[in-house]
Amino acid sequence: MVRDIRDLTSDPGAYAAELQRRWGGLLSYRYIGRHHASMNVGPVDDTVIVRHDMRDVTGGILLSVFGIAAPEGGLVSDLEAVPNPVVHSCQVLDAGVDVRRFEVRTEDVKRGQRMAYSRSLIVDADHPGRVLAITEGQGVTIGVPPEGLPKMTVEPLEVIDSPDLPPLWQVFAGRQVDATTWTLPELSAEVASPDAALHVGPQFVMTETAARSSITELAGTGALVGVSSHTMFVARAKSGPFTFVAEPIAGGDAVFGARTQVYDEGADRKLVTVATHLFRHAEQGRAS
């Protein structure tokens, strides 16, 4: 069982050591190469290098990659609070087929006693005037850590870009049941937030994967470009296995939607997350 770091609040040394272990081992940010200067030792670097596994079959950047890179929640770091996500949205202006790197430009919207809000522009790092996506979100503080926590040392993962890289859903141990249903195994430390709940990273990846899969079945093609995503985290996903069930919806003008519900099977099939994704049909191609 993954431990909730809030159990260590009365022991600053143990809390700091556990946060270092958990943050340093969290797969979401390390796998896509996202550095958070508010948490990590080292220089500020808000760019992400785009690999083959971060693109769909048309070459567009995946909605889940934008979500992991800009998780929002009000710029509240784990050094000052125990944050939890509430709502996240992403609107894509440019799929970034020829973009090699993108930069996340986040701004604090408002921070209250418990609730916090932020938004970001995601731009082409080599041509900053080119906006790829807009994200925004809301987070909540569910605990207060000991004072004086130091920044974390995080060893980056060296992922060599290749067309043969496994899809992100496979990296996070996802499994397909059918066209509309996917699963993740029981909660493990590398996919858990410090408060012992399924991190937003695998949730972004698997809700998009289930949505795309369901629409591919409906539309008869996987050549789908992400348009938008909206995710509501309605309860902490604490146990697992987790089931992702998507409902595809056909629209007009080659636009398709999917509504996905996430259930914690280890907690009496509790509904923990709901997400909506929009895609448009496009000609299949390769990223240049």
Task: Go through the PLM ranges and name each one.
Residues M1-H88, D98-V99, R119, G129, ...:
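Hydrophobic, helix-prone linear segments
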Residues R30-H36, V86-L93, Q170-A173, V227-M232, ...:
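Short structured motifs
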Residues V48-V50, V92-L93, L187, F233, ...:
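Hydrophobic residues in beta-strands and at strand termini
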Residues T209-E247:
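Glycine/small-residue-rich hydrophobic helix-like segments
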